[in-house]
Amino acid sequence: LVLVGLEKYTYEEGETLCADVQIANYGKTDCAGDLEWTLWAYMPNEELDSVRKVAVKSGHMSAVSCPKGTLSKAGTLKIELNNKITAPVRCDLTVKIADAVNSYPIWIYKNEMPKCPESVYETTKLDLQAKKVLDNGGIVYYSPKSEESSFHNSIRAQFSTDFWSVGTFGRQEGAMGQLIQKDHPLFKEFPTESHTNWQ
Protein backbone atom coordinates (compact mmCIF):
# COMPACT_ATOMS: atom_id res chain seq x y z
CA LEU A 1 0.00 0.00 0.00
CA VAL A 2 1.41 3.39 -1.01
CA LEU A 3 0.76 6.09 1.61
CA VAL A 4 1.17 9.84 1.15
CA GLY A 5 1.24 11.93 4.34
CA LEU A 6 -0.58 15.04 3.12
CA GLU A 7 -0.76 17.97 5.56
CA LYS A 8 -4.01 19.13 3.99
CA TYR A 9 -6.27 18.63 0.98
CA THR A 10 -6.71 22.23 -0.18
CA TYR A 11 -3.94 24.38 -1.65
CA GLU A 12 -3.50 27.72 -3.37
CA GLU A 13 -1.73 28.22 -6.68
CA GLY A 14 1.94 28.95 -6.04
CA GLU A 15 2.17 26.67 -3.00
CA THR A 16 4.39 23.61 -2.92
CA LEU A 17 2.79 20.32 -1.94
CA CYS A 18 5.31 18.57 0.33
CA ALA A 19 4.53 15.10 1.64
CA ASP A 20 6.40 12.02 2.80
CA VAL A 21 5.65 8.83 0.89
CA GLN A 22 5.68 5.49 2.70
CA ILE A 23 5.14 1.94 1.50
CA ALA A 24 3.32 -0.49 3.80
CA ASN A 25 4.49 -3.90 2.57
CA TYR A 26 2.93 -6.66 4.62
CA GLY A 27 2.92 -9.12 1.74
CA LYS A 28 5.00 -12.27 1.30
CA THR A 29 7.75 -10.75 -0.87
CA ASP A 30 9.95 -7.67 -0.99
CA CYS A 31 8.89 -4.85 -3.29
CA ALA A 32 11.33 -2.67 -5.20
CA GLY A 33 11.35 -0.36 -8.19
CA ASP A 34 10.66 3.19 -9.26
CA LEU A 35 7.83 5.00 -7.52
CA GLU A 36 5.83 7.05 -10.04
CA TRP A 37 3.48 9.91 -9.23
CA THR A 38 1.05 11.92 -11.33
CA LEU A 39 -1.09 14.95 -10.50
CA TRP A 40 -4.30 14.67 -12.54
CA ALA A 41 -6.58 17.71 -12.89
CA TYR A 42 -10.28 17.49 -13.75
CA MET A 43 -10.56 20.24 -16.38
CA PRO A 44 -13.88 21.45 -17.82
CA ASN A 45 -14.53 20.53 -21.44
CA GLU A 46 -17.11 23.15 -22.37
CA GLU A 47 -17.61 21.84 -25.92
CA LEU A 48 -18.90 18.51 -24.58
CA ASP A 49 -20.32 19.94 -21.32
CA SER A 50 -18.18 17.48 -19.39
CA VAL A 51 -14.92 17.14 -17.49
CA ARG A 52 -11.69 15.61 -18.78
CA LYS A 53 -8.84 14.24 -16.69
CA VAL A 54 -5.48 15.80 -17.64
CA ALA A 55 -2.01 14.99 -16.27
CA VAL A 56 -0.54 18.36 -15.19
CA LYS A 57 2.55 17.17 -13.30
CA SER A 58 4.41 13.88 -12.95
CA GLY A 59 7.65 12.48 -11.64
CA HIS A 60 9.32 9.51 -10.03
CA MET A 61 11.59 8.35 -7.24
CA SER A 62 14.24 5.89 -8.41
CA ALA A 63 15.16 2.55 -6.85
CA VAL A 64 12.73 2.47 -3.92
CA SER A 65 13.18 -0.60 -1.71
CA CYS A 66 10.34 -1.94 0.45
CA PRO A 67 11.25 -5.09 2.42
CA LYS A 68 8.36 -7.40 3.33
CA GLY A 69 6.82 -6.93 6.75
CA THR A 70 7.79 -3.26 7.06
CA LEU A 71 6.62 0.30 6.64
CA SER A 72 9.35 1.91 4.51
CA LYS A 73 9.94 5.58 3.73
CA ALA A 74 10.17 5.98 -0.05
CA GLY A 75 11.03 9.68 -0.07
CA THR A 76 9.42 13.11 -0.06
CA LEU A 77 7.22 14.59 -2.77
CA LYS A 78 7.71 18.28 -3.61
CA ILE A 79 5.22 19.41 -6.23
CA GLU A 80 5.02 23.08 -7.19
CA LEU A 81 1.39 24.00 -7.80
CA ASN A 82 1.83 26.71 -10.40
CA ASN A 83 1.43 27.75 -14.04
CA LYS A 84 -0.80 24.95 -15.41
CA ILE A 85 -3.79 25.62 -13.16
CA THR A 86 -5.67 28.86 -13.89
CA ALA A 87 -9.02 28.23 -12.15
CA PRO A 88 -10.13 26.34 -9.04
CA VAL A 89 -9.72 22.65 -9.79
CA ARG A 90 -10.19 19.22 -8.22
CA CYS A 91 -7.14 16.98 -8.71
CA ASP A 92 -6.06 13.43 -7.93
CA LEU A 93 -2.53 12.71 -6.77
CA THR A 94 -1.80 9.14 -7.88
CA VAL A 95 1.23 7.24 -6.59
CA LYS A 96 2.35 3.82 -7.86
CA ILE A 97 5.08 1.27 -7.25
CA ALA A 98 4.92 -2.18 -8.89
CA ASP A 99 1.23 -3.24 -8.63
CA ALA A 100 0.45 -0.97 -5.66
CA VAL A 101 -1.47 2.20 -6.57
CA ASN A 102 -3.14 4.79 -4.37
CA SER A 103 -4.87 8.08 -5.12
CA TYR A 104 -5.60 11.17 -3.02
CA PRO A 105 -8.01 14.02 -3.84
CA ILE A 106 -6.72 17.58 -3.55
CA TRP A 107 -8.19 20.95 -4.53
CA ILE A 108 -6.23 23.92 -5.83
CA TYR A 109 -7.64 27.45 -5.68
CA LYS A 110 -6.52 30.80 -7.05
CA ASN A 111 -4.42 32.86 -4.66
CA GLU A 112 -6.73 35.85 -4.58
CA MET A 113 -9.26 37.36 -2.23
CA PRO A 114 -12.60 38.08 -3.95
CA LYS A 115 -13.92 41.61 -3.53
CA CYS A 116 -17.40 42.14 -2.19
CA PRO A 117 -19.52 44.28 -4.56
CA GLU A 118 -20.54 47.67 -3.16
CA SER A 119 -24.20 46.67 -3.51
CA VAL A 120 -23.73 43.83 -0.99
CA TYR A 121 -23.43 44.28 2.78
CA GLU A 122 -20.86 41.78 4.11
CA THR A 123 -20.92 40.91 7.81
CA THR A 124 -19.82 38.28 10.32
CA LYS A 125 -22.74 39.11 12.65
CA LEU A 126 -26.45 39.43 12.04
CA ASP A 127 -26.41 43.00 13.35
CA LEU A 128 -28.83 45.94 13.10
CA GLN A 129 -27.24 47.16 9.86
CA ALA A 130 -27.78 43.73 8.25
CA LYS A 131 -31.44 43.76 9.30
CA LYS A 132 -31.85 47.30 7.97
CA VAL A 133 -30.33 46.33 4.59
CA LEU A 134 -32.64 43.29 4.37
CA ASP A 135 -35.72 45.33 5.37
CA ASN A 136 -34.93 47.71 2.50
CA GLY A 137 -34.67 44.85 -0.03
CA GLY A 138 -30.87 44.82 -0.09
CA ILE A 139 -28.45 41.92 -0.22
CA VAL A 140 -26.52 40.69 2.82
CA TYR A 141 -23.59 38.28 2.67
CA TYR A 142 -23.56 36.70 6.13
CA SER A 143 -20.40 34.73 6.91
CA PRO A 144 -20.11 34.12 10.66
CA LYS A 145 -16.74 33.36 12.22
CA SER A 146 -16.08 29.66 12.73
CA GLU A 147 -16.27 29.73 16.51
CA GLU A 148 -18.63 28.35 19.11
CA SER A 149 -20.19 31.72 19.96
CA SER A 150 -21.39 32.09 16.35
CA PHE A 151 -22.91 28.60 16.21
CA HIS A 152 -24.08 27.94 19.77
CA ASN A 153 -26.95 25.66 18.66
CA SER A 154 -24.92 23.74 16.09
CA ILE A 155 -22.92 20.55 16.15
CA ARG A 156 -19.34 20.13 14.98
CA ALA A 157 -19.12 18.80 11.43
CA GLN A 158 -17.08 15.64 10.92
CA PHE A 159 -17.06 12.53 8.77
CA SER A 160 -18.71 9.58 10.47
CA THR A 161 -19.77 6.19 9.14
CA ASP A 162 -23.14 4.63 9.93
CA PHE A 163 -21.49 2.10 12.23
CA TRP A 164 -19.62 4.69 14.32
CA SER A 165 -22.63 7.00 14.39
CA VAL A 166 -24.22 8.97 17.20
CA GLY A 167 -26.91 6.28 17.37
CA THR A 168 -24.31 3.78 18.53
CA PHE A 169 -22.02 6.09 20.50
CA GLY A 170 -24.07 9.00 21.83
CA ARG A 171 -21.24 11.24 23.01
CA GLN A 172 -19.85 12.07 19.58
CA GLU A 173 -21.02 14.68 17.12
CA GLY A 174 -23.97 13.70 14.95
CA ALA A 175 -23.31 15.19 11.50
CA MET A 176 -22.46 12.72 8.74
CA GLY A 177 -22.30 14.79 5.59
CA GLN A 178 -24.25 16.64 2.94
CA LEU A 179 -26.13 15.93 -0.26
CA ILE A 180 -25.01 18.63 -2.71
CA GLN A 181 -26.60 19.71 -6.00
CA LYS A 182 -23.22 19.99 -7.72
CA ASP A 183 -24.61 21.45 -10.99
CA HIS A 184 -26.13 24.47 -9.18
CA PRO A 185 -24.81 27.80 -10.61
CA LEU A 186 -23.40 28.59 -7.15
CA PHE A 187 -20.70 25.96 -7.76
CA LYS A 188 -19.73 27.13 -11.26
CA GLU A 189 -16.24 28.14 -10.12
CA PHE A 190 -16.03 25.85 -7.10
CA PRO A 191 -15.27 22.22 -7.99
CA THR A 192 -17.50 19.99 -5.91
CA GLU A 193 -19.15 16.59 -5.82
CA SER A 194 -22.62 15.47 -4.78
CA HIS A 195 -21.32 14.50 -1.33
CA THR A 196 -19.18 16.05 1.39
CA ASN A 197 -15.44 15.96 0.80
CA TRP A 198 -12.31 17.62 2.22
CA GLN A 199 -12.45 20.89 0.28
Please place each PLM-identified region on the residue numbering.
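Short, solvent-exposed loop/linker segments at the N-terminal edge
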Residues: Y9-E15
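Outer-membrane beta-barrel proteins
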Residues: E7-Y9, N25, P67, L81-N83
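Low-complexity, Pro/Ser/Thr- and charge-rich linker/hinge segments at domain boundaries
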Residues: W107-K125
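A glycine-rich, often tryptophan-bearing local segment used as a flexible ligand/cofactor-contacting loop or short
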Residues: L126-Q199
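Proline-enriched interdomain boundary motifs that mark the N-terminal boundary
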Residues: V2-G5
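Beta-strand-rich binding/interaction modules
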Residues: T16-A63, S72-E80, A87-A98
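Hydrophobic beta-strand core residues of beta-sandwich domains
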Residues: Y11, C66-L71, I85, L134
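Short, structured interface segments
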Residues: D92-E112
